[in-house]
């Protein structure tokens, strides 16, 4: 899979409802220059965190299995996404085995997927795109651009206080850098 980042700003009409408060999100640029919407608690001291725990991702809203898209297929897609997300975040900060002191908890949701040049599609079309992209890619299939809509909350591993929120369209690379870039 080639990494691809959409150049389109995330439109408020595409917000999934996964994050509790979208009003604090502000436009920003990722280290690679891609647009993101994010909020970081101005009081957060990133230096007090030494590890990150990535919760299992979820589709939001949750799709229902069909005769075309089985529960097993949906599980394969999230398994692949989880592995890729842990690999990418683990390249930035050590992974923790669970929440706790000094740990940032990442709570991610897959909210949209696109495998074409037309831009990100709303959630309704995810199953078709995921069948062709997520599963084929997970099984070593064709090489193509895959844009993913991601919403994530970053929580304190002890208090569960929201430290940051992010909403972006990308191939889930450098998620932690998007949230907490180094100066």
For the regions a protein language model found, what residue spans apply to each?
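A short acidic/glycine-rich loop-to-helix N-cap element
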Residues: 175-183
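Surface-exposed short loop/turn segments
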Residues: 87, 91-161, 178-179
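Bacterial Sec signal peptide processing site at the extreme N-terminus
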Residues: 1-23
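Post-signal-peptide N-terminal segment of Sec-exported extracytoplasmic proteins
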Residues: 26-52
